[in-house]
C-alpha cells in the first residue's frame, strides 16, 4: 500500500487504539467483529475482546467506532 493510503488509516486507527474506543469491524464476507484495537500495521489489525484476533486488512470492509473520535491528518502538499 502506498504511503498516501496510510494518511487516513494510521491516524484513525491510532486514535481508536489510544482512546480505547470499542469498534465494530465488518468483514467483506459480512461477519461482524467487535472489540478494541490493540495494535495494527500495514497488513493486520489486532482486535481484542475475550481473546486477541489478528484480522487482515484486506478482509475488512468497514470500521465503525462506538463513539465519535477526533484525529489529525498531517497531509503533505501534492507536488
From Swiss-Prot:
GO terms for cellular component: cytosol. Keywords: RNA-binding, Stress response. The keyword Disulfide bond does not apply. NCBIfam families: Hfq, PRK00395.1. Belongs to the Hfq family. Homohexamer. This is RNA-binding protein Hfq.
Amino acid at each position: 500500500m502506498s504511503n498516501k493510503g496510510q494518511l487516513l488509516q494510521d491516524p484513525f486507527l491510532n486514535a481508536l487504539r489510544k482512546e480505547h474506543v470499542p469498534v465494530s469491524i465488518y468483514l467483506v464476507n459480512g461477519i461482524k467483529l467487535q472489540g478494541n484495537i490493540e495494535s495494527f500495521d500495514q497488513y493486520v489489525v489486532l482486535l481484542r475482546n475475550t481473546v486477541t484476533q489478528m484480522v487482515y486488512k484486506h478482509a475488512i470492509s468497514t470500521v465503525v467506532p462506538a463513539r465519535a473520535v477526533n484525529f489529525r491528518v498531517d497531509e503533505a502538499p501534492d507536488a
